[in-house]
C-alpha cells in the first residue's frame, strides 16, 4: 500500500512539473515533434 502511494505521488509530481514546463514555453516545436 505504501509503494502505491509513493508511486502515485511521484507520477503526479512529475506530471505537474512537465505541464508547468510545457505551458511555460510556447509548444510550437514540441507539437511538431510529437505529431
Swiss-Prot record:
What InterPro entries does the annotation carry?
A: PSII_PsbT, PSII_PsbT_sf
Give the signal peptide, or none: none
Q: Give the UniProt keywords, A-Z.
A: Chloroplast, Membrane, Photosynthesis, Photosystem II, Plastid, Thylakoid, Transmembrane, Transmembrane helix
Set out the biological process GO terms recorded for this chain's protein. Answer: photosynthesis
List the GO cellular component terms.
Answer: chloroplast thylakoid membrane; photosystem II reaction center
Report the domain of life of the source organism: Eukaryota
PANTHER family registered for this protein in UniProt = PHOTOSYSTEM II REACTION CENTER PROTEIN T, PTHR36411
Q: What is this protein called?
A: Photosystem II reaction center protein T
Amino acid at each position: 500500500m505504501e509503494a502505491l502511494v509513493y508511486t502515485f505521488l511521484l507520477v503526479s509530481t512529475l506530471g505537474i512539473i512537465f505541464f508547468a514546463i510545457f505551458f511555460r514555453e510556447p509548444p510550437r516545436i514540441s507539437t511538431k515533434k510529437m505529431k
